[in-house]
Amino acid sequence: MNYELTKDFINVHLNDDVNKLALSKFPDDIDKQFVIRQIQARQLLKKKLPSWSENDELLFPKRLSLEQCSSELTAKYKRTISQNDAKTQSRDASMAPAIKHIDTSLHRILVDLTGGMGVDTSFLSDNFDETIYVESQAELCELAEHNFKVLKKNIKVVNAKAEDFLAQCGEVDCIYLDPARRDEYGRKMVSLHDCSPDVAE
């Protein structure tokens, strides 16, 4: 696939009706399925995640992940909450410098156990010195790794189940998770035990 040609094609047809576009003939070196998915994603995210939708270097996953990801407004709000927590930790450390177990250097580590599209991870990472994105789906990990580089975010991507990662994880400052509340068929889950990962365990 010719990436530059594909990107130009997407930008030209960004506002097209994707159903009609899917019936049209595509150049041989452009992946029709990939292009349709990217155009659909940008149209869906135009209001929900404007800064990502407008960045033509970013790549997007299947529709279910788009529907489940946080909006830009929500992700920024979560970032504000974690920023306030950082200020509290900094204040507590400065008030008790003689207590040896308090690390006044405050190298803060965040682990997002439900990485998904990486929206929350990306915004939350601004308040941490080290950020680890954990996701069980390999395709989402590949897309997240690409997008984090585009966004100039220094985030480590780990392809693993949340439970497996936690079993070998060292000490961190913040663990974030937003479990999937829909199954692979898009059906809404009600019980916490049905969510992935099972946060009730």
Where on the chain are the PLM-derived regions?
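SAM-dependent transferase fold signal centered on methyltransferase-like domains
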Residues: 1-201
